[in-house]
Structure formats: structure tokens, C-alpha cells
Curated annotation (Swiss-Prot):
EC supergroup of this enzyme: lyase
Pathway stated in the Swiss-Prot or TrEMBL entry: Pyrimidine metabolism; UMP biosynthesis via de novo pathway; UMP from orotate: step 2/2
Function: Catalyzes the decarboxylation of orotidine 5'-monophosphate (OMP) to uridine 5'-monophosphate (UMP).
Family: Belongs to the OMP decarboxylase family. Type 1 subfamily.
A GO term for molecular function: orotidine-5'-phosphate decarboxylase activity
UniProt xrefs under InterPro entries: Aldolase_TIM, OMPdecase, OMPdecase_AS, OMPdecase_bac, OMPdeCOase_dom, RibuloseP-bd_barrel
Name of the protein this chain belongs to: Orotidine 5'-phosphate decarboxylase
Organism: Hydrogenovibrio crunogenus (strain DSM 25203 / XCL-2)
Catalytic activity: orotidine 5'-phosphate + H(+) = UMP + CO2
Pfam families tied to this protein: OMPdecase
Keyword annotations: Decarboxylase, Lyase, Pyrimidine biosynthesis
GO cellular component: cytosol
EC number per UniProt: 4.1.1.23
Amino acid sequence: MNQSVQPDPKVVVALDFPKTQLAEDFARHLDPQLCRLKVGKELFALGGPQLVEKLITQGFEVFLDLKYHDIPNTVAMACRAAAEMGVWMVNVHSLGGRKMMEAAKEAVLSASHQPLLIGVTILTSMETEDLAEIGLTGTPKENVLRLAKLAHSSGLDGVVSSAQEASDLRKEIGQDFCLVTPGIRPANADVNDQKRIMTPADAMAAGSSYLVVGRPITQAKDPIAVLNEINASIGR
């Protein structure tokens, strides 16, 4: 008897909408076998756990992108709550340090449902001069590598980082570390406010595991066509 192969969509659509109804309406036009969904700070503030649970009920795997950054106990409790919500992925700021990340991982492992726990390294909108203003020396790439190594040694499943760093992260950390890449734009799309961007095919070739795509899909005249085009470009 043949067992069906579970889909593993590589595209994570960022539901960056100002109203929950808009996000829900948009999600209804998508296929859980073609993409996962990301719920960020604005949408979660508007819709809360109820929205996330509704999306999960519709068959979507959800990346809860709240970037927790606080004392270890507070972050641990937040990560456990997110895990019990049933999300596929949740993230914390690597700059919170080893103790915070280890507490977060322990909390996730103790939950009845265990999502991937991902560390945020350096925001894709930041460049060397931006880092210098907050007291971090070196380039974004150097800081991403340092924080990714810290996240890995703290037990996290992967990091959020731009595609430009993916090949170096693969060399330094290995193939089993999950790399979640925002700043993804199809070749004909506007770059908007993200500096370190790359096309979907180039990002996957560089070593990215999952691609976060927002406005090029959500603001497209034909979102499904764009999603299908991206999937085709990465061989999905």
C-alpha cells in the first residue's frame, strides 16, 4: 500500500493586512498544499489566537512571527503558549542571548505540540551603519553568522536570515539547520523597504529552506498566478 507524501511548501506567504477580515478573505483563496502562512505583529494584535487557530483549522501551517525578546522566563512562557496554539513555527530574537534561547527551546519541547523554534539574527532592513548606531561592530553578514552560531548552539532549529548569508551559514553550521529567508522578490517586483533581497530560485540555490514572500503575492492582481510562478521557479 502506497503512503501519500505530505506536501512541504517552501513559500510562506506573509499575511500583512491591516484588518483580520482582509487576511481571512485572502487566505481562503490560497491552497495549504502550495504555501504556508505567516502571521506577524500587526495581524496578531488585531486577530489574536482566534485568527491563528482559524487558519490552522483551514489546513494551513502557520509561522507566528512575533520575535520574542525578553527575560528567559517570559519568553519561555510565550513560546509555550504559541506551541499550544498549534503553530508550525515561532521565533525569538537571538540578541536575547543563550539563556533566553535555551529557555525558549525547553518550553517548546515541553508542549503537547512542538513547533520549529527559529532565531531572528539581523533584520534585513539593517546595514553596517545601522548596526554601528546600536553598538554592533562588523557587517550584517558577520553579525548574522555570529548570532546564527549562537542560536544553533543554544538548541534552536534555525534562523531567519537573508539569502545572501545562506551559503556561508550552510558551510559553517550544516545542512540540518533551517534557514528562513525574508526579502524574497520575484525578478520583476519592487524591493520596497528590504535591502538584502534575492529571487526565489537564487535563494533556494544558496541554501534557504523556506522563503517568506509578502507584497509580491498579497498585492498582486493575480496572487495565485504569482504563487504558482514562484513555486515553479524553485521546482515545486
